[in-house]
Structure formats: structure tokens, C-alpha cells
């Protein structure tokens, strides 16, 4: 799923940042955790790999009831979540929940980010 099988036998200096990140995600999931803490899980990934990771997180949440707490600055990655807390200056600025459409949720995220960025 994460495309890391071909990395078997490679040394750490032989893998890219994205390959290392996908390997770290696999390592975090190997023991079937009930909670997953993800700090910028798509930060070093291309858009295709980011989509694979976020769809995997959605799948394990739905099928295995794995709660994922994720920190991200990526609105597209955030749109895969069911609930988002926006933090500004160490305090909760806003909170939104996903309805039926991820695309609509993405637009809501962008709207909040526009407001958040305008409060200087």
C-alpha cells in the first residue's frame, strides 16, 4: 500500500525523504494502534503518495476505529479528517466538522484559513 517493499535492504542514506516518511508511517501502523499521532504526515510526500496515506488513515479509522490526531498545514490533507481544530497563538481559533462531502469540507477549511490569515 505504501510502496516501500522495494526499500528492503537499502541503507537509510539511500532512501528519499518521502520513502523515509512512508516507512515511518508503516512502522507506526504495524502493531495496529488504537490511536495514531501524526505530525505533518504528508510533509515530504508527493500528491499521489499523500492521497494514498490520507486514504489509508481514513480506512483504518473507519474499519479498525483508529483515532488519528494529526498536525498539518496542508488543507487538502486536513480535508480527509472528520473534525478540525484551528489553533492560533496557542488557543483554539475555530472548529469545524466534515459533512457529507470532502470537497465542501475542503472549501470550509479554505474559508477559515482566509479568516485566520486576515487577523493580523
What is the predicted role of each segment?
Residues 36-39:
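Catalytic Walker B motif of ABC-type/P-loop ATPase nucleotide-binding domains
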Residues 25:
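Hydrophobic anchor residue at the start of the ABC signature
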Residues 56-70:
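Conserved catalytic loops of ABC-family nucleotide-binding domains
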Residues 1-7:
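Conserved ABC ATPase "signature" region
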Residues 91-115:
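Conserved beta-strand-loop-alpha-helix hinge in the C-terminal portion
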